Amino acid sequence: MEAQKPKIALYVQRSFGEKLTATFDFIKENWKPLMKFTTYLMLPLCLLQGLSLNGLMSGTMALGDMTGGSFDSSVVGASIMALVTYYSLYAVLYLLGTVMLTSLVYALVRTYNEREERLEGVTLGMLKPLLFRNVRRVFLIMIIGVLLVLFVGLIVGFIATVIPFMAIAFLFVLLVVVVSVPLAIWAPVYLFEDIYIIDALKKAYRLGFATWGGIVLISIVMGFIAAILQGVTMIHGISGLL
């Protein structure tokens, strides 16, 4: 019988390479529960989102065909309303899917860290309390995040209007980008720990500035990998439209 590998510790200082190794080791060890619970939660949303995207593409093509023929304002108006409806539904489902997937992944990681048995024998019913807790917290982070973006956008717009020198405005935008990097660990801190959202924000900045370069590198690498996987999975759908 193969000996079980040591549990992957969360709260450990690691180099950049060790962070990537720990991430892929966790996925390799727990890909079955990750796949199972993701399918349970995301498949219904994906089906509805696929229908809305199909309606959106069909409506777009139909509207494009109308431009080459006779113009009927009532038909065009109805087609535009249908496009807005399909796109709104697609956006809402995308938002729900992002919230559900984020909440699920962090619930599984926290459960893995707290149980001696790791994720062995974990059921969706066992995850439900933690999952609902994470959903509420992710929505709260999104709301406060949108407010912060609007606030910063107003400040940037005001500075760009008042200060005539574009170099100063550019430096301010660059400063905003630098300060925004620690926000990448705001959600992990808030979802992993039982603390208030403001305390999580303070801790994210304290830890984020200390590991600023690592956060940027991890974000770039993971974003690159996600883009490749997304491109591969979208090939079939795009080829079907050609």
Question: Where are the regions a protein language model picked out?
Answer:
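Interfacial transmembrane-helix boundary/kink motif in multi-pass membrane proteins
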Residues: 34, 120-143, 203
